Amino acid sequence: MIDYPGRAPLGPLDLSVGPREIIAVVGASGAGKSTALRLLAGLERPASGAVVRPVEPGRTGFVFQSPTLMPWADARTNVALPLELSGLSAAEARRRADASLAAVGLGDRPSARPHQLSGGMAMRVSLARALSVEPDLLLLDEPFAALDSITRRGLIEDLHRLWAARSVAMVFVTHDVEEAAYLAGRVVVLSAVDGRAVTDIPMPGPLPRPEGWRRDAAYREAVEAVADALGSSMDRTP
């Protein structure tokens, strides 16, 4: 549970994340989705209860809704500098930065500055920065919210590809029901009333999704199940 002055407490929230799971967290505005990620990342402290993270400190990557890139720095520096500040040598930080940029399709743009990048490319740099810590857990707070549908779809496919290649669990926040059902193996719906998890829905089908899975009846049924749960979560009657 977490308390903010002047508003009702959020939670309690009981959420477990297994190795290599992909979990989507959906809910109305103010339900506590971003707060849940910040608790998992150790950026917030619960008023009661505990957050147990069986991963090493520094092994959690966080992708914020805004790329939050340093405007004066090129893509490589935006990824490498936080690593150097955490104690890595300049050579190792540069190696990880170049490898992470290549992993997100920007291996040919290490010298590009933020103003030279599209919104999708800037988000890829932010993703590369999160991957550069070689995380066991990757947290993504509505990373696609400001992007067009084509760019969003490309980044979703990239996340599936990266997940398949790495031993990483992912938890991401989204308002998009179809996005949640497609990307995740589980969808957790938070109550609009108090932020507790009201539904935890397993998604059918393999991950990564096979080509054409969006046309599968199981996908449509999963989308409807999440949409129904989200609608029910917004019932504010006592």
Regions found by a protein language model. Name each.
Residues 138-141:
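Catalytic Walker B motif of ABC-type/P-loop ATPase nucleotide-binding domains
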Residues 26-28:
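The feature captures the beta-strand-to-loop junction immediately N-terminal to the Walker
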Residues 41:
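Helix-to-loop junction immediately C-terminal to a conserved catalytic motif
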Residues 112-115, 133:
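Conserved signature/switch motifs of ABC ATPase nucleotide-binding domains
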Residues 1-12, 19:
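A short, flexible loop at the N-terminus of ABC-type nucleotide-binding domains that lies
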Residues 73-80:
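Short coil-to-helix segment of the ABC ATPase nucleotide-binding domain corresponding to the Q-loop/switch region
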